[in-house]
Amino acid sequence: VVNSISKTGNATGWRVGWAISPKAYTPALRAFHDTMVIQAPTPFQQAAVTLLELDRSSYVAIRTAYVSRRDLLVGALRHVGFGVSPPQGAYYVFARYADVPRIGGVSPVAATQHLLKQVGVACVPGDNFYAAGGSTSHYLRFAFCRSLSTLKNAAERLASLG
């Protein structure tokens, strides 16, 4: 079992996680781990312990907040023509933009630049996550791990595309 506090703990980038394995595998896991990462800072580890000690209602509240944010962003993207399948466990949306007015016929980089400079919404080209020019050539990635007010503002800005 491998897990982390990244999404649940709103601590992306902290790289605090753990692995549970049969004793026979532990030396190999440690050797691999030692070559891949450094120790997480002590305050991050202490924060992770605090997170793991929360009661179930805290996790339900975190999930509810993410679902609200996801649904807001997905609705805003669909409203202007993005093709979107709502994610079930991530805090980002991978959206097809081929049918979106003003950006449908351009490259992923040009689409992200237009959205940032003309609309005021930041996203990342889908090609950053897959081979360029493949089936992801008309996809953009939007994150919804922001405040609800920031996402509402982004939704209003995205509406200008339609």
Model-assigned labels for residue ranges:
Residues 1-162:
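PLP-dependent class I/II
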